[in-house]
């Protein structure tokens, strides 16, 4: 089936299939479980014809793969590639593996770009996979080390490659960490947004820019790879 889905019934019913070549920003406050939300979306309906490339600036590649294993996904038979920007910043000289390629740090955009390109070549050219998903978690970490113009150029390249490959990209941004101009500049690269906000002791999400009107806000919980939505209670 052409296109992609989020694996969240209420949102997928509203959005329909997400067209190939789409890039989305996921933006929300700290501690809103964006990492888990992102991984759950990426893991939805992974098949033999699906490739996933995850740039991790928060945790080592082994921990990312461990999450997928915990969800019952056979890593050895999957097409999952992790660009690990963490391990070598901790002074650990861990080697690359078939599923994990190490960048020296989140500031090493050239190295990160090379590793992403290696996985894209493996999945799209050598294996000729039909679908590719790319995520960067998070852009905010990268922006701590590089200026906006440099990050914009880097993103322009890879959002363009996602479009050219008929893929699906999701890129995480921490709300409240950046000024309005930074967010406005980054938004130019994306087709829409997954917005997250706090509601009391919980968090709610909606999708903006993919249809004529934003979706409704839904509170969410995450159990493993399952995302459970509920409409916020009215005061």
Language-model features: locations:
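Nucleotide-state-sensitive switch-loop elements of NTP-binding domains
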Residues: 58, 65-106
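Phosphate-binding/switch region of NTP-binding enzymes
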Residues: 167-168, 172-235
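Phosphate-binding/switch loop-helix module in NTP-utilizing enzymes
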Residues: 89-157
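Conserved beta-strand segments of the P-loop GTPase G domain that flank and frequently precede/overlap
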Residues: 25-29, 54-56, 83-84, 135, ...
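Conserved nucleotide-binding/hydrolysis micro-motifs of P-loop NTPases
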Residues: 31-32, 58-62, 87-90, 139-141, ...
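Substrate-engagement module of ASCE P-loop NTPases
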Residues: 150-177
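Loop/turn-to-beta-strand initiation segments
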Residues: 51, 79, 130-133, 164-172
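Glycine-rich P-loop/Walker A and Walker A-like loops and their local beta1-loop-alpha1 context
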Residues: 3-66
């Amino acid at each position: 089936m052409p296109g992609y889905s989020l694996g969240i019934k209420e949102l997928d019913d509203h959005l329909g299939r997400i067209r190939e070549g789409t890039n989305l920003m996921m933006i929300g406050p700290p501690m809103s479980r964006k990492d888990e939300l992102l991984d759950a979306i990426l893991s939805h309906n992974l098949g033999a014809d699906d490739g996933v490339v995850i740039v991790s600036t928060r945790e080592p590649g082994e921990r990312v793969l461990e999450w997928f294993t915990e969800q019952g996904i056979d890593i050895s038979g999957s097409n999952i590639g992790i660009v690990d920007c963490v391990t070598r910043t901790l002074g650990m000289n861990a080697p690359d593996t078939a599923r994990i390629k190490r960048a020296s740090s989140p500031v090493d955009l050239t190295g990160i770009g090379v590793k992403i390109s290696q996985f894209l070549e493996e999945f799209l050219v050598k294996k000729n996979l039909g679908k590719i998903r790319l995520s960067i978690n998070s852009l905010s970490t990268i922006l701590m080390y590089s200026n906006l113009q440099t990050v914009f150029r880097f993103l322009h390249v890879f959002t363009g490659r996602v479009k050219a490959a008929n893929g699906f990209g999701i890129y995480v941004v921490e709300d409240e960490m950046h000024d309005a101009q930074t967010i406005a500049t980054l938004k130019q690269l994306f087709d829409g947004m997954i917005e997250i906000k706090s509601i009391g002791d919980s968090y709610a999400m909606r999708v903006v820019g993919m249809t004529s009107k934003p979706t409704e806000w839904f509170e969410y919980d995450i159990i493993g790879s399952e995302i459970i939505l509920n409409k916020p209670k009215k005061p």
